[in-house]
UniProtKB/Swiss-Prot annotation:
Keywords: Cytoplasm, DNA damage, DNA repair, Endonuclease, Hydrolase, Magnesium, Metal-binding, Nuclease. Pfam families: Endonuclease_5. This is Endonuclease V. It is found in: Cytoplasm. It comes from the Bacteria. Its main location: cytoplasm. Mg(2+) binds at D43, D108. Its cofactor is Mg(2+). The keyword Metal-binding applies. Belongs to the endonuclease V family. Coiled coil: none annotated. The keyword Metal-binding applies.
Length: 226
């Protein structure tokens, strides 16, 4: 799939932070305009000094259609809050290989529940111009109250009285997941779509399967490096 080139990735951390603040003003949150038929799940992992991006394509019945991946050397250091500069270029190379028209992309990571509203789901949402949702296992930014211990109970992640995400109990007796819109989707739709793709597991199928294949490919690549 094609994408829009927004900026150079060759930035020092201070300039990257400035850029995030500027890009956050370009985010749009609006209802989805078409029925959901295909979705993508994205997971990024690392093997030594290489980054691996995995994109899985699922239909609305959660059937796996295709797995895409790309691996290359990392060019940006690990800095909390700037992970998109480390992971984004690798994801975009994998995205270029995708030949399915997906309706929503789920990222393992955050959307606007980020200090500058620029988690990986938001940042990449601007590049690919597709509705994106961030699904995370840990809070990065904002305040919340723990939801009840019932499946699909939820509370909001807030910052300065603004709702920036949702804390969802996807299963009883497990820690909640943290959902936030990335771009071109509303907070409520981010929640409803996530719920639609949850089965018996904690994570929704798009990011769960992306992580599963990421681990398999990472192991394979790691063996090749030996």
């Amino acid at each position: 799939m094609e994408y829009k080139k927004l900026h150079s990735w060759k930035l020092i951390p201070e300039k990257a932070i400035e850029l995030q603040k500027l890009l956050s003003k370009k985010l749009t949150f609006k209802p989805l305009s078409k029925e959901i038929n295909l979705v993508a799940g994205v997971d990024l992992s690392f093997v030594k000094d290489y980054g691996l991006a995995v994109i899985v394509i699922l239909d609305k019945n959660m059937e796996l259609i295709k797995v895409y991946h790309h691996i290359e050397k990392i060019t940006f250091p690990y800095i909390p809050g700037l992970l998109a500069f480390r992971e984004g270029p690798i994801f975009l190379k994998a995205w270029k290989k995708v030949n399915h028209n997906v309706d929503v992309v789920f990222f393992d990571g955050h959307g606007i529940s980020h200090p500058r509203s620029m988690g990986i789901a938001s940042h990449m949402g601007l590049w690919i111009e597709q509705p994106t949702i961030g699904i995370a296992k840990k809070i990065l930014f904002g305040n919340y109250v723990e939801p009840e211990n019932k499946k699909f109970s939820f509370t909001y992640i807030t910052y300065k009285n603004q709702k920036i995400g949702i804390v969802l109990r996807s299963r009883e007796n497990v820690k909640p997941i943290f959902i936030s819109p990335g771009n071109l989707i509303t907070l409520d739709e981010s929640l409803e779509l996530t719920k639609q793709f949850i089965t018996k597991y904690k994570l929704p199928e798009p990011t769960r399967l992306a992580h599963k294949y990421s681990q398999l490919l990472k192991k394979q690549f790691n063996e090749e490096l030996q």
